[in-house]
Amino acid sequence: MTRRIVLALSHSIEEHDQVKLLSSIGHDVFSIGGYINPGAPHDDKRPALPDVKQFPLLQRAVDELGSSDNLGAAQSRIPDGILDWADTIIYHHYLDRLYGQWPRIRDWLRGDSNRRVIWRSVGQSVEGNERTAVPFRHEGLERVAYSPKEQNIPGYAGHDALIRFYADPEEWKGWTGTEPVVIQVTQHLRQRDPYTNWGFWEQATRGLNRMPLGPGSEVIGGPGSVTYNTMRGCLQNARAYCYTGTQPASYTLGLLEALVTGIPVISIGPAHMNIFEYGPDLFEGHELASGWSDDPGKVQAVLRKLLNDPDEARMVSEHQRARAIAEFGIEKVRAEWAAYLR
């Protein structure tokens, strides 16, 4: 069956991926976010989706709210016309926007057995979110988790499905490693420390040819914001990637894109995920990467070897990419979402 899905997400890159994926399954997808018009997104971190169906009447219902933040207002109270149109609603981690209108959403949900409201967790849930969600889960809120490690959060509210983030291997490919440099793609790596573990990056890459990428990287020797195509080119050409995580996420889309592109990824270990007491048990990035250590000196030694030995890097790349596609490739994840939304 074709579902009429309203997305109320809080991550423009994941929004792009979800609009693309769910539309490719055959569903009608309307996003209350940067991709409200898929052909002209508000954010340039990912490309436009001109082939995705547009819904101008639904967009008008948001545009005419007259708020200083129409998207936030529409997520906080879905306009009646959009609610009448939808049979499936999916939220990310700003769940107060959902809970604040829960009585009318609950009534809507009970009005038709085909209707569904789903919390898609994306690596931002902590103990408070989980405990708050429990009564809503009892009243019909579904949950699609993105990592098995989420179950280690105290008070975990449970899930109805575990479906990974994905990366399309036809989009994320072409690694050559011709430039002996270590990179990382993270927004505000230095500014958001300790959540981004910038100190580990600094120690593990000190003395190596390195280049952090992303907004804010200009203060630590990087170019700052780069275009989507430039970022992809860096993933293809750089020899190695040093991943330091973003707490409390188990893993990130940036990690997946690196893994599937094939650039050898060496990760920070879980011991550094200590902002939350349960952080080490929540982290998964080190298990997905090609190597890891809690010791930045050991990570540096592996990175140095990759920089000096392109043949070794090539072997690591081939194994890593095949494993990443098997776990996170678009075909696998598309089939899982298709089955869940039947």
Q: Can you annotate each of these PLM segments?
A:
Residues 236-250, 263:
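Acidic donor-binding loop of glycosyltransferase active sites
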Residues 166-228:
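Conserved catalytic-core segment of nucleotide-activated headgroup transferases in glycan assembly
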Residues 90-194:
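Catalytic core of nucleotide-activated saccharide and alditol-phosphate transferases
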Residues 1-104, 292, 327-330:
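N-terminal pre-catalytic "stem/leader" segment of glycosyltransferase-like enzymes
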Residues 294, 307-341:
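A charged, aromatic-enriched C-terminal amphipathic alpha-helix characteristic of glycosyltransferases
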